[in-house]
Every structure is written in C-alpha cells, then in structure tokens.
C-alpha cells in the first residue's frame, strides 16, 4: 500500500480495505473510505488543498475520487471506460497531472476542472506508455516516455523539450526520483542505475551495486536528512 503525509498529526494509508486516515501517535485508524474495487489503490496523492485524489480501483481504474481531509467524498471525476488511471501528481502551479493508459490529463487542483493541453504536447504524449511524471526544477515536469526518453515540460510556457537525450527508456519499467538538488535518479529495476545531476551531462552509478548479488531496485527514497534509501530484491 501507500503511506502519505497529511499533516503533523495524520497519515493517509491505502490498504486492502481502501483509504484510511491514521493518527501518527496512536496508529489508530480514525476513518475509512471504501468503494467496491478499490482495495490497495496505487494512484493516490494529497493536493496542496489538503484533499485526497485517489483512483477508484486498484486495477483498471477509470474514475478519480476527490476526498476532503476527513475522507468525505467531495467529487467524482468520471473518465472513459477504456482509459485506465496509472498515477496522479501535482505541479508547482497547482495542476493535477493524471497519467493514463492513453496519455496525460490535467486538472486544476482548486476548481477540479479539466484543463486543455497544447496540441503539440498532446501529440507527443497521446497513446504512449508513460513511465513517470514528476514535478521538476522550478515550474517544470519531468516526463518519461517509453522508447523515446525523458522530456522536460515548462508548465508556464507550455513548452515540451527532450532532456538527457542519451536515455531512451527502452526498458519495461522504471523507478525515478528527483532529489532536493534536482538530480535525477533512474533505475530500470533490473541491472542498470543512472544519476543525472542538474548541471552535469551524465553519470553512471552502477558501481554502487557491486556488493549486491542481484541489484533489483524496487524503490528509491531520500529522507529529510538527505540519505538515499533503496529497497532492492535482497
């Protein structure tokens, strides 16, 4: 499941029952939100408005539930029945980006209205497998498109450009994380691991796994002290 930080007192956790609000001190569940088919949803985030945006199902999710901080349903955003939701993130301009099986959708985090995207952006991302969408330096997004590579999208200017062109993302799946120095940590979850600093061209940190028999990276996380935590297959 997922663990999200709501505020100083509360966590939002997904488990087999649905979405739970949990007290950090007592670890007691104050409230659940559950709809048929939800289970352990993967596409979920907490917006800048302290609202929970979550997919309506674990598999083949088509709709988004917007919940308040007490997990009361505020609104349902209905999607197409043949378009499946994969992830939800918010950028610095308070736009919610929804990755789907057929491309990207964008919503206003405050009004919940869908926003129109530039034609060239839609052509570049529509009907393609998108590995990740992450808030990046200042008001940018980092977008990873399968078989093509990484793109940087200027949200204010609405301009999409290729980024680190050596990387074409030809693998089946990727783990990507952006640190506080705007460095990009990228793994294909098999045997390759790359670090892209903000200003340098390219570095390969695969040697970090020399002591591991099977360097299968599942997750990357930087904690508040700046340490990198990796969850591997061992």
PLM segments and residue spans:
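Carboxylate-rich, polar loop motifs that coordinate divalent cations or form catalytic acidic clusters
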Residues: 1-234
């Amino acid at each position: 499941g997922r663990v999200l930080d709501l505020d100083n007192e509360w966590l939002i956790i997904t488990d087999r029952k649905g979405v739970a609000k949990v007290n950090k001190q007592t670890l007691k569940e104050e409230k659940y939100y559950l709809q048929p088919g939800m289970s352990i949803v993967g596409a979920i985030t907490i917006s800048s408005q302290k609202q929970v945006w979550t997919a309506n199902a674990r598999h083949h999710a088509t709709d988004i539930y917007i919940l308040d901080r007490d997990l009361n349903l505020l609104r349902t955003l209905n999607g197409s029945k043949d378009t499946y939701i994969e992830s939800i993130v918010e950028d610095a301009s308070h736009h919610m980006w929804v990755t789907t099986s057929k491309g990207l959708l964008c919503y206003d985090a405050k009004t919940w209205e869908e926003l129109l995207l530039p034609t060239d952006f839609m052509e570049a991302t529509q009907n393609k497998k998108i590995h990740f969408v992450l808030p990046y330096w200042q008001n940018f997004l980092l977008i990873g498109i399968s078989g093509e590579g990484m793109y940087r999208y200027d949200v204010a200017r609405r301009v999409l450009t290729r980024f680190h062109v050596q990387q074409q993302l030809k693998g089946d799946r990727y783990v990507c994380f952006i640190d506080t120095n705007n460095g990009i940590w990228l793994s294909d979850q098999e045997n390759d691991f790359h670090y892209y600093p903000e200003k340098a061209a390219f570095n390969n940190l695969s040697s970090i796994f020399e002591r591991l028999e099977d360097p299968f990276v599942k997750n990357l996380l930087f904690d508040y002290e700046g340490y990198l935590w990796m969850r591997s297959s061992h």
